[in-house]
Amino acid sequence: MSQAPGAQPSPPTVYHERQRLELCAVHALNNVLQQQLFSQEAADEICKRLAPDSRLNPHRSLLGTGNYDVNVIMAALQGLGLAAVWWDRRRPLSQLALPQVLGLILNLPSPVSLGLLSLPLRRRHWVALRQVDGVYYNLDSKLRAPEALGDEDGVRAFLAAALAQGLCEVLLVVTKEVEEKGSWLRTD
């Protein structure tokens, strides 16, 4: 169906899950994959596989509210034939071959609040970044809506700011082939 002359193209549909409980790892996975593939139950099953004989599973919250660790994210991606590659913060971001990367998952310090009261504490929070129709988006589940970052320069600026704050870890979500060839890293 063609558009009327002068009509604005409709914005792309960007899948974005909002924060529930401590399920930011589940939300980050689904947001980076742009569809609901994982649930709390699926993440809990991965935890059981990672530590089958453990009474207190080290890969999630003791309260059963989520708060999954990086091993759950990596195992979830591996189950889909994908890989998570740690980005070495000492490398310049110009070496990141973004066209080879499906998306990014960041682990950031996040402020803690009780209602309107901000506490002087910080917890870890998983955030997804993904390109949709040529535009990179911040798909943080704590945001009301996806935040457009723009092109490759925009996402590099966002990453540089996050890494400059310290305590930020970056995972590149790539295909197995990209992981094996190391083509997520520019050689020029």
Curated annotation (Swiss-Prot):
Gene: JOSD2
GO biological process: protein deubiquitination; proteolysis
Subcellular location: Cytoplasm, Cytosol
Gene Ontology molecular function: cysteine-type deubiquitinase activity
Gene3D superfamilies per the UniProt record, alphabetical: 3.90.70.40
Lineage, highest ranks first: Eukaryota, Metazoa, Chordata, Craniata, Vertebrata
The protein's Enzyme Commission number: 3.4.19.12
InterPro entries named among the record's database cross-references: JOSD1/2, Josephin
The name this protein goes by in its record: Josephin-2
Organism: Homo sapiens
Outcome, altering residue 24 to A: Loss of deubiquitination activity, no change in subcellular location
